């Protein structure tokens, strides 16, 4: 994960509480795809005690804003097919399902849905 966060073509955002402790983070990898510059959400994680407080939404919206300002036209991510909470979360943010990738999580042999979102032009 550290290699993604430190890459030149990455957006890495960290949410902190008042005392400086980390409450969550998001890492977005930027790359040229068939439709232009794309952002791929490598990971989004929020500490359990800070979930359902808007931390994940703020991280994602800021990552999308920064990506859009850099010329990213589309964001993409994968989510475990059984993670109903995450699926609802991403759909609320405007992501739509674009297929399934079998055994995406190879170690556990689990499938993942591919989600995408078009970003507004800046």
For each feature predicted by the language model, list its residue ranges.
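Acetyl-CoA-dependent GNAT
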Residues: 1-49, 60-62, 66, 70, ...
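C-terminal "cap" of GNAT-fold acetyltransferases
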Residues: 12-13, 73-76, 80-87, 93, ...
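Residues at secondary-structure transition points
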Residues: 32, 36, 54, 58, ...
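Conserved acetyl-CoA-binding loop-helix of GNAT-fold acetyltransferases
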Residues: 46, 52-65, 84-92
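Short coil/turn segments at alpha/beta junctions that flank glycine-rich nucleotide-binding fingerprints
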Residues: 53, 70-73
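Beta-hairpin "wing" of winged helix-turn-helix
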Residues: 98-100
